[in-house]
Amino acid sequence: MPDYFICDLSHTSQRISSEYIPYAIGCIKSYYHEHGKHDVNIHLIKYPEDLSPEFFKHKPSIVAFSNYMWNTDLGYGFAKAIKEYSPQTLIVFGSRNYPLETVRQIKWFEEHPCVDLYIIGEGEEPFKRV
């Protein structure tokens, strides 16, 4: 059974910004298990220190990141490392933190070449289609 990761990484250097799994990625996992067509193990990752060991343990075919202004660099740093090690892994970013204008969207992908797909807004239905 393939593994997918959905990450909403939280900075932990000073203190944990939230002790709970973010609601949005929990909803995506729940929706996928109810409506998805494939048997998949979906892992929710919150803490950056958990992502690397879990990645090497499970070798997921998809790694998705919630992309907010406070964790863009954190998520992209991991996305870049994952692509260097495993170019076949699909990297998905998602949230409303994405330009609306086509020209700026193209520029965003040029500045973030490790991202294969961006889901704008609610992610439940689009992630199911990935």
Where are these regions (language model features)?
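Glycine-rich beta-alpha loop elements in corrinoid/cobalamin-binding modules
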Residues: 31, 39-130
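Short loop/turn segments at strand-loop or loop-helix junctions that form parts
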Residues: 7-11
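Zn2+-dependent metallopeptidase catalytic core
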Residues: 35
